[in-house]
């Protein structure tokens, strides 16, 4: 989808916060030098995540947005204009996602988990570990706040973060993690004080499949061993040695059977549900989803939307 977006439509990019998860959007914005990029950063420390930063506005996000609202309040810009511009695309995209039926894969696992959590009768919080887990969570368009261990590009501490959170609350704490992040931080499960309110869904496809989606790495002879960390490890032994409940799924039927126990079974100790998939199948499903997004973008072209709304949208001018 990113390839089809017309860069000349972007006058300015304003970024707030820290690192940017989506590599596709980063690549899209890095491939244009037409628009300005201003970062809102109280410290003044540059990040230049799109590699053509114009400058930094040294301010807190709240103060900046408040000042922007004050400056533009009388320029006839109204939220309804933007809503009119974006609603057709967003509606079609949401309908597409709801109608998309993924085959057995990591995306299916996360989607089914999120859908099932809408029907539970207890409070809970959701953690997504890092990298692919975070991306899959974002694809589900959850209306709930989610926590993630996304720092720069590290995978360390994902399980420790969720485990520590679970000790500070009686609420159910769910954590969705990839295999590398889980095994890297398995020592978090040594803690004998952990309780049954910690539930970990482990997505195991034998390595870091995100790397196969990056241009160039998919053809590298070294990618499997030295970049994606290919392995043949599972979490059963780790769970047994730490008195952690363990469930496993290798197909759709096993997944749904395990998911019921994962969400409802009362335990005194944490539970891990390990979902085994194949990285090629995982990436195929994501490719299919990308294609659907591209089709939505073509049908609801930004050019047509802009022309229909141009009579009402008055751009800000200093």
Question: Locations of the language-model features?
Answer:
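Glycine-rich, acidic loop regions that bind phosphate or pyrophosphate groups
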Residues: 1-86, 192, 214-215, 263, ...
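Short, well-ordered alpha-helical microsegments
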Residues: 21-25, 110, 133-137, 183-186, ...
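Short His-Asn-centered micro-motif
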Residues: 15-17, 40, 128-129, 149, ...
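Short glycine-rich anion-binding loops that position phosphate/pyrophosphate groups of nucleotides
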Residues: 17-21, 43, 131-133, 180, ...
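Local beta-strand N-terminus motif with an aromatic residue
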Residues: 10, 53, 123-124, 178, ...
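Active-site diphosphate/adenylate-binding microenvironment
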Residues: 86-170, 316-317
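Thiamine diphosphate
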Residues: 139-318
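Structural motif
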Residues: 12, 125, 172-174
């Amino acid at each position: 989808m990113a390839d089809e977006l017309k860069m000349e439509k972007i006058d300015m990019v304003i970024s707030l916060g820290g690192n940017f998860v989506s590599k596709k959007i980063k690549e899209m914005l890095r491939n244009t030098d037409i628009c300005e990029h201003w970062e809102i950063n109280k410290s003044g420390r540059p990040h230049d995540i799109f590699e053509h930063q114009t400058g930094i506005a040294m301010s807190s996000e709240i103060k900046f947005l408040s000042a922007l609202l004050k400056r533009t309040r009388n320029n006839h810009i109204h939220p309804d204009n933007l809503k009119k511009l974006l609603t057709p695309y967003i509606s079609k995209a949401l309908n597409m996602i709801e109608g998309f039926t993924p085959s057995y894969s990591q995306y299916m696992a996360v989607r089914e988990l999120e859908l099932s959590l809408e029907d539970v009768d207890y409070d809970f919080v959701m953690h997504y570990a890092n990298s692919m887990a975070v991306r899959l969570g974002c694809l589900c368009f959850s209306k709930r706040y989610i926590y993630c261990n996304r720092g720069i590009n590290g995978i360390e501490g994902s399980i420790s973060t969720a485990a520590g959170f679970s000790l500070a609350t009686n609420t159910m704490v769910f954590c969705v993690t990839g295999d590398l992040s889980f095994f890297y931080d398995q020592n978090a499960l040594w803690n004998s004080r952990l309780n049954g309110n910690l539930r970990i869904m482990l997505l195991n496809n034998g390595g870091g499949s995100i790397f196969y989606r990056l241009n160039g790495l998919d053809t590298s002879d070294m990618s499997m061993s030295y970049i994606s960390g290919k392995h043949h490890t599972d979490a059963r032994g780790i769970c047994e040695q730490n008195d952690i409940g363990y469930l496993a799924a290798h197909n759709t039927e096993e997944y749904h059977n395990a998911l019921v126990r994962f969400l409802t079974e009362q335990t005194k100790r944490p539970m891990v549900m390990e979902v085994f998939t194949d990285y090629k199948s995982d990436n195929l499903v994501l490719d299919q989803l990308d294609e659907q997004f591209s089709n939505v973008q073509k049908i609801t072209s930004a050019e047509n939307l802009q022309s229909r709304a141009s009579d009402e949208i008055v751009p800000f001018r200093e």
